[in-house]
């Protein structure tokens, strides 16, 4: 889950097959980071798990508006698709992994780097976390 404000990866889950618990766990993890008064919009593709009643109900309970891309239109998800492209070129294609567990450990390290250390020109030369922290300090 990526925050459009600063490009920070808020949370993620990984599994060997697409099951609803991956999405529900990710949503629960994101909820723990939110203040009750936060007003949000969550955008996704039209994957079956994002259309399930429990998922939609969880969003409604938190007052979160749901937005879904048009069917078969990757451009509606350009921000996350761009992140995946960056992650592949900076992380996936440059490394070899001995096991799934090794991959998961290295992915966690990369996400931490991406959020805390990797600077972005559009964030005035700051990392996503630095940018968010800076904005909170001057607000």
Predicted segments, located by residue:
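Charged DNA-binding/catalytic regions of mobile-element recombinases
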Residues: 1-139
């Amino acid at each position: 889950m990526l925050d459009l404000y600063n490009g920070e990866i808020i949370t993620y889950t990984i599994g060997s097959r697409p099951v609803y618990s991956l999405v529900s766990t990710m949503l629960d993890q994101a909820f723990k980071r939110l203040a009750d008064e936060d007003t949000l919009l969550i955008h996704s593709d039209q994957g079956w798990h994002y259309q399930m009643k429990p998922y939609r109900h969880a969003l409604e309970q938190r007052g979160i508006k749901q937005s879904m891309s048009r069917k078969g239109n990757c451009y509606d998800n350009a921000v996350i698709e761009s992140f995946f492209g960056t992650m592949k070129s900076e992380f996936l294609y440059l490394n070899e992994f001995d096991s799934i567990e090794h991959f998961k450990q290295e992915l966690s390290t990369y996400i931490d780097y991406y959020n805390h250390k990797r600077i972005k020109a559009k964030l005035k030369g700051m990392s996503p976390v630095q940018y968010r922290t800076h904005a909170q300090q001057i607000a």
